[in-house]
């Protein structure tokens, strides 16, 4: 059965709006932690930044694996398999806890690895201090993300937004209290920032769990019943889909880490400009990220129900609408780059004049960069809704590391393109991914429709 594009767009926006807001809230939490590090000392900012980068790199893989929960629950819900959806959500929690333990052990033993990679001992010491309590945030964070996937798959993403916004406010207040030693609390420095993140993450997970436990909308999905008995079959299904998603997240994060290293080779001015421009681009990127999650749920819902025409329509609507939104951001970057960079640094300050100019140049490239990045992440979400993450991983690996990274190196160091050359290389890799993933979604749909040709034709003629 076909679904009108306007009808699908309304349903998509109802689901995506709160998810976008929750993404922005999470970004604000990260920004708050960075600002708090700067309030302690320059050394705390450098070492804490190293620890935060290490935490992000490890946790992003876990986050990708847990993303499978929402996809598979949506497919089961579409198939009206309530018991199967419940079982997958329960085992998603077990998987989240196992990943949290594994990631925490890695982070607690990361100090020798950082030293091996040539990091300054004083920065490694500060990073180790930050990572003393920060890994305790992982059980709460991954539990929250698993439950977020579950409730979003049921079409209820508003509680995720509300809890995320409250968590952002509490994160700021608790950080200030521990850094300033207010209300008789000790000044815990970097360790305190990690502690606050852990407490807030656990609080957010608890709040969402209690909401799901008490709200009547979830009565048909008793997560507590049978939670103590994990299913190996369900865990394997989650792992098979989640592993390539986690791998895709890591190769994309790795591409941007490569870009930062290239900027560092060029100099401090280029690296600082890169960080400012990337902060602006990352904020805008929260919109297609939220849309991508929502598109995955919508496509998965129809795919599980066997309504392949509606699944194709949901993917196309998401990709098309995402392209329109990112075109608007691209126009903004082209028309107002100075104003956007001026939100971060003063163009009239001689100390920042060179950084300002480079950041403006990067933002002009980001107009194309952002358009392609938005399209590729939504197309990726569409394919995952069809229970296929291997295709997205392979396309991402090829486009990011066989096109994007070599192009960035070629444009910068061989052709002398400087910082702008790195971003043109990234844009080329993302453009390759956007085209390949969009065609990949259409190819997957064509194959599925071909296999179900008799039923589909019957449904259309009816």
Curated annotation (Swiss-Prot):
CDD domains: MATE_NorM_like
UniProtKB keywords: Antiport, Cell inner membrane, Cell membrane, Ion transport, Membrane, Transmembrane, Transmembrane helix, Transport
A Gene Ontology molecular function term of the record: xenobiotic transmembrane transporter activity
Cellular component terms (Gene Ontology): plasma membrane
Origin: domain of life: Bacteria
Localization of this protein: Cell inner membrane
Keyword Cell inner membrane (UniProt): yes
GO BP terms: monoatomic ion transport
TM stretches of this protein: 12-31, 51-73, 93-115, 125-147, 160-179, 189-211, 238-260, 275-297, 318-340, 350-372, 393-415, 419-441
Membrane disposition: Multi-pass membrane protein
Pfam family, one: MatE
NCBIfam families reported in the protein's UniProt record: matE (TIGR00797), PRK00187.1 (NF001214)
Family note: Belongs to the multi antimicrobial extrusion (MATE) (TC 2.A.66.1) family.
Function: Multidrug efflux pump.
Protein name listed in UniProt: Probable multidrug resistance protein NorM
Lineage: Bacteria, Pseudomonadati, Pseudomonadota, Gammaproteobacteria, Pseudomonadales
